[in-house]
């Protein structure tokens, strides 16, 4: 038995066209389908299913029972070739489901690097997740959701299709998102998904200076506390953004919203 074979459990099933780096480990009763590529250092636990076309990067850990790269749960899907792309250093826990894209949605679902995707999380077709995100147990994304870097979804939270979640946002437990969430925003733990302030603690942990946090708070108050119509609030935020990259990011997010801003 060669060294690579010894890293693959004898009960695992590896399709002929799957491509595995020599040090990839595959657990018991796992199925690796056709057109799956898995890069070096990745560990696939027991009872996982990974369907292609799927590309998985380096040093990922699939703990067990995950269903990855399955067909999208979209009635418009007609069997067209679509794919799932997963980056490096992600941890994907038990019973996570991540679906491939659809032809009508760009054809790709993508997961970045260094994400922590916990048990029973569902990430639907055509979603795009950035880097360093956390999805707590039972978090769910409907189709076409875009999630920026450093976002945290608490347990049992979810996002409606086509929503965007800006960088450094925090989504509270049990919250249902039905609009775009601006960067840096904290969404309260209720089913209405109402903004409750900025994610101050998360920003501190990411080494934002007090001055940066104060500027973000000021922009938040302009948008959410001052009682201004959105058009007028955007004008004031634009003034604040002239010499501040964080506020420029916030303003650009607002101006490119495809769904109503969660407000």
UniProtKB/Swiss-Prot annotation:
InterPro entries xrefs: Acetyltransf_C, Acetyltransf_C_sf, Hexapep, Lipid_A_LpxA, Trimer_LpxA-like_sf
Enzyme class per UniProt: transferase
Keywords of this entry: Acyltransferase, Cytoplasm, Lipid A biosynthesis, Lipid biosynthesis, Lipid metabolism, Repeat, Transferase
Localization annotation: Cytoplasm
Gene3D superfamilies tied to this protein: Hexapeptide repeat proteins, Udp N-acetylglucosamine O-acyltransferase, C-terminal domain
Catalysed conversion reaction: a (3R)-hydroxyacyl-[ACP] + UDP-N-acetyl-alpha-D-glucosamine = a UDP-3-O-[(3R)-3-hydroxyacyl]-N-acetyl-alpha-D-glucosamine + holo-[ACP]
One GO-annotated biological process of the protein: lipid A biosynthetic process
E.C. numbers: 2.3.1.129
Pathway(s): Glycolipid biosynthesis; lipid IV(A) biosynthesis; lipid IV(A) from (3R)-3-hydroxytetradecanoyl-[acyl-carrier-protein] and UDP-N-acetyl-alpha-D-glucosamine: step 1/6
GO cellular component: cytoplasm; membrane
GO molecular function, one term: acyl-[acyl-carrier-protein]-UDP-N-acetylglucosamine O-acyltransferase activity
Xref: SUPFAM superfamilies: Trimeric LpxA-like enzymes
PANTHER family in UniProt: ACYL-[ACYL-CARRIER-PROTEIN]--UDP-N-ACETYLGLUCOSAMINE O-ACYLTRANSFERASE, ACYL-[ACYL-CARRIER-PROTEIN]--UDP-N-ACETYLGLUCOSAMINE O-ACYLTRANSFERASE, MITOCHONDRIAL-RELATED
HAMAP family, per database record: LpxA
Family: Belongs to the transferase hexapeptide repeat family. LpxA subfamily.
Function recorded in the entry: Involved in the biosynthesis of lipid A, a phosphorylated glycolipid that anchors the lipopolysaccharide to the outer membrane of the cell.
Subunit structure: Homotrimer.
Stated name of the protein: Acyl-[acyl-carrier-protein]--UDP-N-acetylglucosamine O-acyltransferase
Species of the source: Xylella fastidiosa (strain 9a5c)
Gene that produces this protein: lpxA
